[in-house]
């Protein structure tokens, strides 16, 4: 995934979840749309180097999207729309391996309802298997350990529980985390942030739901899927924000 018209700037402040003010290389303060409603406190620090996509001449309230932040010489993409695009492309081109799928994917559809939830991807294989994939972006990291979530998520908890039900009805089920940064050796659930979500993941894995993590090679203007990363619920994550 490549971004066009990328400009480097420096983060000033984020008055709400959707808006941030940044200082560009011309010395101008610009208003930007933050493409991620998560907290991102460990990333969006005053003076942090950020990547902005310039989108001029539109009816938007801002002419820029804030898509990436540099932390300790590593770029973190924070575009919340990106993981789904990377996921479907990676699944279809074989970069992402989904365990237990025994033949080629012959049909897929996005945003499919099951029960009271809408899952990101629905798949059917040539041998008749049916699968749901729920995709989550991951941007929280400390000491090369990635964690989800960076804020409590009722929707995420609901998805995990619905996937358990789908698996019990015969679907192959997957939770796919796209870590929007490169340098991590393990991923986990942030139990301190949301204990009930960690419990739900334990039940889900015991029920047969597969949890998969892929990291990405990230620059200020490009994001490329890289490789599978181990997921372990027993890994202790130290939140840099707490």
Curated annotation (Swiss-Prot):
InterPro entries (alphabetical): SfsA, SfsA_C, SfsA_N
A GO molecular function held by the record: DNA binding
Pfam families (alphabetical): SfsA, SfsA_N
PANTHER family assigned: SUGAR FERMENTATION STIMULATION PROTEIN A (PTHR30545:SF2)
Assigned protein family: Belongs to the SfsA family.
UniProt name for this protein: Sugar fermentation stimulation protein homolog
């Amino acid at each position: 995934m490549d971004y066009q018209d990328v400009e480097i700037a420096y983060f000033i402040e984020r008055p709400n979840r959707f808006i941030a003010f940044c200082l560009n290389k011309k010395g101008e303060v610009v208003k930007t749309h933050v493409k991620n409603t998560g907290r991102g406190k460990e990333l969006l620090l005053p003076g942090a180097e950020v990547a902005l996509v310039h989108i001029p001449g539109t009816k938007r309230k801002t002419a820029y999207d804030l898509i990436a932040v540099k932390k300790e010489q590593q770029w973190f993409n924070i575009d919340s729309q990106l993981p789904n695009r990377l996921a479907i492309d990676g699944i279809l081109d074989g970069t992402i391996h989904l365990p237990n799928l025994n033949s080629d994917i012959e049909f897929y559809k996005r945003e499919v309802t099951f029960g009271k939830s809408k899952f990101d991807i629905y798949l059917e294989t040539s041998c008749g298997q049916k699968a749901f994939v729920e995709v989550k972006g991951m941007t929280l990291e400390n000491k090369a350990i990635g964690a989800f979530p960076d804020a409590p998520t009722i929707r995420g908890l609901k998805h995990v529980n619905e996937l358990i039900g789908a698996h019990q009805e015969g679907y192959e089920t997957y939770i796919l985390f796209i870590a929007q940064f490169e340098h991590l050796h393990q991923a986990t659930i942030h139990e301190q942030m949301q204990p009930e979500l960690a419990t739900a993941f334990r039940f889900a894995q015991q029920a047969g739901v597969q949890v998969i993590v892929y990291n990405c090679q990230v620059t200020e203007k490009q994001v490329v899927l890289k490789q599978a990363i181990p997921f372990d619920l027993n890994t202790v994550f130290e939140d840099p924000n707490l």
